[in-house]
Curated annotation (Swiss-Prot):
GO molecular function: transmembrane transporter activity
Family: Belongs to the major facilitator superfamily.
InterPro entries: MFS (IPR011701), MFS_dom (IPR020846), MFS_trans_sf (IPR036259)
Domain of life (superkingdom): Eukaryota
Organism: Penicillium expansum
Protein's name according to its UniProt entry: MFS-type transporter cnsO
Chain positions covered by the region annotation Disordered: 1-24
Polar residues bias spans: 1-13
Length: 518
């Protein structure tokens, strides 16, 4: 199989050693910065590099993961609220409930690329506290809903404000971590989503005891408590969340990194693919380039059909599915916790393996296969109420498989788009379709009238995974592998004579020296 190292073959003239490779840079300013990077590579070797990574991990991962935990709770707590009488109190039918969930994804998906562009322009220290506090406030207002129309309006507003967290966090991680490190970090971050599934059940179980307090139903308490926690988290972002590394001025860095650590943190990502780097200046042309790139649409297919459709449908329907196995509404909330804990562990493990092997495609296909096996077993066993244990086991597999694919799809995208502005736009665009298409479909395919067998829901999930995700993933992998082979046969010296360093940098991943991560 082809090597998936994304570092390009380096030049063979005006040389400077970097390990076993020989490098060339022709522009004087580039030489200075790249030589500085090579020097820092030697300074930050072994224990000092691990120390830097620990600092980055401790600053970024807990903060972003907790924000995503709250985002996932505030987005999916409607499934828990349903069991606490939300539909009856607001006079909603099951169909209206599904439609309200679907409407959320329209504003959510349409706002994702816009939010990521804003993040790229103003930075995370300003943008993230704003959007987190905004959706926390809207979540608390959900506790005051008194009609179906009011609930729909609130869900539309929630979609606008929550949209920036998921794609934004992926982009932030891609600005601090190299392609060989990012899969594990995205998996840890995404694990907060599955952890939310676990905590959501526990929190809902605890909030259930508040039913009737101060004349409020339990579902109102659920939205109020989770919304207040989110507002607090948004305010904490002002102090905990760092800016992008290139936004810090020389000599005016940050207290948690030394000036040298901050400089290396920025340069090691900038030159992760060799001496030719993309521009860090925001340009609208890079956004347009992302919209025209074939890679963006292949990753959209994966995120839409293999990720969002089965994941969202499982998230909103799991409490009801577990209740259909014979558990009470309150007990069903708790029983949703173990599958999500298992899914979190599998998610992080797959992310780590994908980083160590740099085989993103194989890890994605493995995750799809695991989720597919779980859905098929569950589809079969729901027809046999006498074996609820097998159905419950299948939920473990489905939750783990469909959760594990998401961060690897994000890492695969980030690793193969070098320009930061184009990468931000591409991540936002692929999540737009994933959220609008996947969320709107996923929230409507498990129809209450078809419970507990859900023939449409299970059948659609299986078909979406195979036809919409596994086949496009294979085509995408094949095309990139073919291009890597073609570029491997080119004459490096001829490329250097034909193009300047600046021209190669402008090409980004289209440069003949770039190799795609497979």
């Amino acid at each position: 199989m082809e090597s998936t190292d994304s570092s390009p073959p380096l030049s063979m003239t005006d040389t400077e050693k970097k390990g076993d490779a020989v490098t060339t840079v022709t522009d004087e300013s580039s030489v200075s910065e790249y030589e500085r990077f090579l020097h820092l590579e030697n300074v930050f070797s072994g224990a000092s590099r691990k120390k830097l990574l620990r600092k980055l991990d401790l600053r970024l991962l807990p903060t972003l993961s907790f924000l995503y935990l709250m985002c996932s709770l505030d987005k999916s707590n409607a499934g828990n609220a349903k069991l606490f009488g939300l539909l009856e109190d607001l006079g909603m039918s099951g169909t209206q409930y599904n439609l309200a969930l679907m409407y959320f994804f329209f504003t959510y998906g349409l706002s994702e690329p816009v939010s990521n562009i804003m993040l790229r322009r103003v930075g995370p220290k300003i943008w993230f506290p704003f959007i987190v506090c905004a959706w926390g406030l809207i979540t608390t207002l959900t506790s005051q809903a008194s009609s179906y129309a009011g609930f729909v309006v609130i869900r539309l507003m929630l979609g606008i404000t929550e949209a920036g967290l998921y794609p934004g966090a992926y982009f932030i991680l891609s600005m601090w971590y190299t392609p060989k490190e990012i899969g594990t970090r995205m998996a840890i971050f995404y694990g907060a989503n599955t952890t939310a599934g676990a905590f959501g059940g526990v929190i809902a179980y605890g909030v259930g005891s508040l039913d009737g307090n101060l004349g409020w139903r339990a579902w109102r308490w659920l939205f109020l408590i989770e919304g207040c926690i989110t507002i607090f988290a948004g305010l904490a972002c002002l102090f905990c969340l760092p800016a992008f590394p290139h936004q810090y001025q020389a000599g005016k860095g940050t207290k948690w990194l030394t000036d040298e650590e901050l400089e290396y943190a920025s340069l090691r990502v900038k030159y992760a693919n060799g001496p030719v780097s993309s521009t860090y200046t925001f340009r609208w042309s890079d956004v347009v380039a992302a919209a025209k790139d074939r890679k963006t649409y292949f990753m959209m297919m994966l995120f839409w059909w293999g990720g969002s459709v089965p994941t969202y449908s499982l998230s909103y329907t799991l409490p009801t599915m577990v209740a259909n196995l014979g558990y009470t509404a309150v007990k069903a909330q708790v029983m949703t916790t173990p599958p999500y804990i298992f899914a979190t562990c599998v998610c992080v493990a797959v992310g780590y393996i994908s980083d160590q092997t740099q085989r993103r495609y194989l890890c994605i296909m493995g995750a799809y296969t695991l989720g597919l096996i779980g859905i098929i077993i569950l589809w079969i066993t729901v027809h046999h109420p006498s074996i609820p244990g097998v159905s419950y086991f299948a939920i473990f597999l489905a939750a783990a498989g469909y959760s594990a694919q998401a961060p690897i799809v994000g890492a695969w995208t980030a690793s193969n788009i070098t320009n930061p502005s184009k990468r931000a736009a591409a991540i936002g665009l692929l999540m737009l379709l994933g959220s609008v298409g996947g969320g709107s479909i996923g929230s409507n395919i498990y129809i209450s009238s078809e419970a507990p067998t859900y023939p449409l829901g299970f059948g659609f999930s299986v078909g979406a995974t195979v036809l919409g995700a596994m086949i496009p993933a294979t085509i995408h992998w094949f095309l990139m592998r073919k291009e890597n082979k073609r570029r491997g046969g080119l004459d490096v010296a001829e490329i250097e004579r034909k193009y300047t360093t600046e021209e190669l940098g402008e090409m980004g991943e289209d440069s003949p020296l770039f190799r795609f991560v497979l």
